[in-house]
């Protein structure tokens, strides 16, 4: 027996004979579509196939998953295939309708929980004052502007708008004014903007607006219960049970989550028993939410908020619950939406009226973000991007529209127009955000040379270090120690960025560490503290501590966009050099290194330690007693990268325990291998300046080495490579160099350049550490 509500508000009971869930098959004379399991699988297959087709067609516009899914549902509904009466009788009969409705509710229960559990409420605190002001403005301004627009519409149009009475139009206005952080998170994740400045500001602002919205919603429900009941003890009971439910979710469920975290070893995924426990808690919270008078989604959202944001929940929930939800439950969800959208029920007047209201509210959302952001001096490009992000709608919005329709708070016509409007606006706004953000990224150019070669001596040398593995921290600190000038005439500004890969579907973070302050008592926090303490010890170990400043950050971001935090910090701090520590040349490290090199606003040096560099902690003592010498080699073949390498090597000669040997590679006629006349002239000036600057330094030597082909270079490095502790080389060289011909064919770590890759190759078996340097990529041309 199934129970449904008809259009006139009465209940309709449908009784059907139980045939079983599985068919015996066509060969036995059974009709598979009369059984629930084959019918469900067929509908899922149809939606998945259609979604893939629409995904391919809309790919040039933007990556809007929800649009393609809803389109698939609409295509199966009365707007397209649903016009075929025979098909409707087969696929969308009474039995299938109730199957779809049930799975639709289950789907949204899981979607709302997973999308909420992904987001850390700490984003609000990190957003600062601007996020609070933006959130308050985003909560109030669209509603006020929408109310004015609603008044204009009702006063100028006779009758109803899309069969909505004034109360229904007000419900439409209220829900169009709301922005959901679950939608924003999904969009930012798809566009790989979670760890961008606009992404962080958008997410924190929307979460603040949602906090105001949820608070207002609870007050409204409480006020409504008082308004419609006599003042007695029973009046307070509904309010008390609602509060008790929310408190119970926190008090009961949070300890269970913490128990699961303790029982799950680090790096391991959720056990099946723990996953079942979470599902039971979710179903219980949802059921109790509906029982006490809340919409059922409140229970799943509340449970998502109390779910810890630490592993194993980030990857475990998405990999196990999320995959099933989006692959199996989501198709049923979009079919239920598509069956309620009928293009043939629309008329032009209703479309224009509702679009005017929706567009006005979207414009108010845009203004409520852009104006406060500009007042707080946020770059106009970032403010505009955030403004468009808050206008994007998604699956979450559509489900809220569906709830309004189920409770008769809006008409079928209004629901259809709102769904189509959400799809069109989201496609347009997502495409705008994607292209505008890409343009902003490409505009990350500097208006001065940020290189070691063009460093101004009267200013501090600014170096940003970044590393994916802790093992690379000691050699990086050693290189920093070598480049530090012991005199008081020069100062050093160091920024360290500890890179951590984001647990899937958690919120990206950029954490600044302060001396003596621990953020959390977790394993990851302990590692971060150790790294920040190492850099602080580096600073405190100098006699002239006032000449060395250190800032430590941890960037938690997806691996594909991790470089954006590095480059954004380098741009903000105006660093002259980025030093990237490479441990073993894994694919992830190489991709990250490549992205940093391509997007960096300054010069980049890639350090690959092979064990010869001493520990920086012992260098001070060894320098005083003269027991340590560090031999450095700089290979000069020609070009911008080699000039940058030489400039950095010369700076290291300020340390009395450093011996520098510059190997200038020339052909048989004592001529540079370069063909470019301008580059030759720049190389000549650089070498002449080097000779003048190091004339009185006894720890510097320049040798010109005759090299005609690649085999000569290989023999030179094999014979002399182990004489040095550190070999410095440029990454990029002219492709026409005969001396490098054939080396790139056997390259294993091409991010180090041809010579750098040769130095770390297994063929040479060298123990010297390698520092490969790339000068700043810029359109600025050096004076000839």
Swiss-Prot record:
Where is it mainly found? membrane
InterPro entries the UniProt entry points to = Cation/H_exchanger_TM, CPA2_transporter, Na+/solute_symporter_sf
Q: Write one Gene Ontology MF term.
A: antiporter activity
| Localization, UniProt | Membrane
Task: Give tissue specificity per the record.
Answer: Expressed in pollen.
Which of UniProt's keywords are assigned here?
Answer: Antiport, Ion transport, Membrane, Potassium, Potassium transport, Transmembrane, Transmembrane helix, Transport
Pfam families named among the record's database cross-references: CHX17_C (PF23259), Na_H_Exchanger (PF00999)
Return the PANTHER family for the record: CATION/H + ANTIPORTER, CATION_H(+) ANTIPORTER 26-RELATED
Protein name as it appears in the record:
Cation/H(+) antiporter 26
Organism annotation: Arabidopsis thaliana (Mouse-ear cress)
> What gene name does this entry carry?
CHX26
């Amino acid at each position: 027996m199934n129970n449904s509500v008809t259009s006139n508000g009465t209940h309709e009971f449908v009784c059907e004979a139980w045939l079983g869930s599985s068919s015996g098959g066509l060969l036995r004379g059974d009709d598979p579509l009369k059984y629930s399991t084959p019918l469900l699988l067929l509908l899922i297959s149809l939606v998945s196939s259609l979604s893939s087709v629409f995904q391919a067609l809309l790919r040039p516009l933007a990556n809007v998953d929800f649009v393609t899914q809803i389109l698939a549902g609409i295509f199966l509904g009365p707007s397209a295939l649903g016009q075929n009466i025979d098909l409707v009788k087969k696929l969308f009969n009474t039995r299938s309708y109730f199957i779809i409705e049930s799975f639709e509710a289950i789907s949204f229960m899981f979607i709302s929980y997973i999308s909420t559990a992904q987001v850390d409420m700490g984003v609000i605190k990190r957003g600062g004052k601007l996020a609070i002001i933006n959130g308050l403005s985003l909560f109030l301004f669209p509603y006020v502007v929408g109310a004015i627009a609603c008044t204009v519409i009702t006063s100028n149009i006779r009758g109803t708008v899309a069969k909505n009475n004034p109360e229904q139009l007000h419900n439409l206005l209220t829900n169009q004014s709301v922005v959901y952080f679950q939608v924003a998170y999904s969009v930012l994740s798809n566009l790989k903007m979670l760890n961008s400045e606009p992404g962080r500001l958008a997410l924190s602002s929307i979460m603040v607006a949602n906090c105001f919205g949820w608070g207002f919603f609870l007050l409204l429900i409480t006020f409504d219960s008082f308004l419609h009941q006599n003042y007695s003890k029973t009046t307070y009971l509904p309010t008390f049970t609602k509060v008790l439910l929310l408190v119970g979710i926190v008090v009961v469920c949070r300890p269970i989550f913490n128990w699961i975290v303790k029982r799950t070893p680090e790096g391991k995924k959720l056990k099946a028993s723990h996953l079942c426990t979470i599902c039971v808690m979710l179903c219980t919270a949802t059921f109790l939410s509906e029982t006490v008078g809340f919409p059922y989604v409140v229970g799943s959202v509340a449970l998502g908020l109390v779910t810890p944001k630490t592993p194993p929940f980030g990857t475990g929930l998405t990999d196990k619950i999320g995959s099933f939800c989006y692959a199996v439950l989501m198709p049923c969800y979009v079919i239920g939406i598509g069956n309620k959208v009928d293009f043939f029920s629309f008329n032009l007047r209703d479309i224009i009226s509702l679009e005017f209201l929706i567009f006005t509210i979207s414009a108010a959302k845009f203004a409520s973000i852009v104006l406060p952001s500009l007042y707080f001096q946020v770059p106009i490009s970032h403010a505009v991007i955030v403004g468009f992000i808050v206008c994007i709608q998604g699956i979450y919005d559509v489900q809220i529209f569906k709830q309004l329709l189920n409770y008769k708070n809006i008409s079928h016509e209004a629901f259809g127009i709102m769904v189509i409007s959400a799809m069109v606006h989201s496609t347009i706004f997502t495409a705008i955000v994607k292209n505008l953000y890409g343009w902003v990224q490409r505009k990350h150019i500097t208006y001065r040379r940020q290189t070691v070669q063009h460093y101004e001596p009267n200013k501090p040398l600014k170096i940003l270090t970044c590393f994916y593995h802790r093992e690379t921290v000691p050699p990086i600190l050693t290189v920093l120690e070598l480049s530090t000038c012991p005199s008081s005439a020069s100062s050093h500004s160091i920024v360290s960025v500890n890179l951590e890969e984001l647990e899937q579907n958690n919120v990206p973070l950029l954490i600044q560490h302060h001396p003596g302050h621990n953020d959390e008592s977790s394993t990851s926090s302990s590692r971060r503290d150790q790294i920040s303490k190492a850099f602080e010890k580096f600073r405190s170990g100098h006699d002239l501590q006032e000449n060395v400043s250190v800032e430590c950050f941890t960037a938690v971001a997806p691996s594909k966009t991790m470089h954006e935090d590095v480059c954004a910090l380098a741009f903000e701090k105006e660093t002259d050099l980025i030093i990237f520590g490479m441990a073993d040349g894994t694919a992830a490290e190489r991709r990250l290194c490549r992205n940093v090199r391509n997007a960096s606003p300054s010069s980049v040096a890639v350090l690959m330690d092979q064990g010869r560099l001493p520990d920086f902690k012992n260098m001070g003592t060894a320098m005083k007693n003269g027991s340590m010498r560090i031999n450095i080699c700089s290979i000069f073949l020609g070009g911008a990268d080699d000039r940058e390498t030489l400039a950095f090597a010369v700076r290291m000669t300020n340390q009395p325990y450093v011996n520098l040997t510059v190997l200038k590679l020339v052909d048989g006629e004592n001529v540079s291998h370069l063909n470019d006349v301008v580059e030759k002239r720049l190389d000549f000036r650089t070498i002449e300046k080097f000779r003048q600057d190091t004339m009185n330094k006894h720890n510097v030597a320049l040798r010109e080495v005759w090299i005609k082909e690649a085999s000569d270079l290989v023999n030179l490095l094999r014979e002399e490579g182990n004489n040095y502790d550190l070999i410095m080389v440029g990454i990029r060289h002219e492709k026409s160099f005969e001396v490098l011909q054939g080396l790139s064919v056997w390259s294993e770590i091409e991010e180090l350049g041809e010579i750098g890759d040769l130095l770390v190759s297994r063929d040479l078996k060298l123990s010297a550490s390698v520092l490969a340097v790339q000068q700043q990529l810029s359109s600025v041309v050096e004076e000839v």
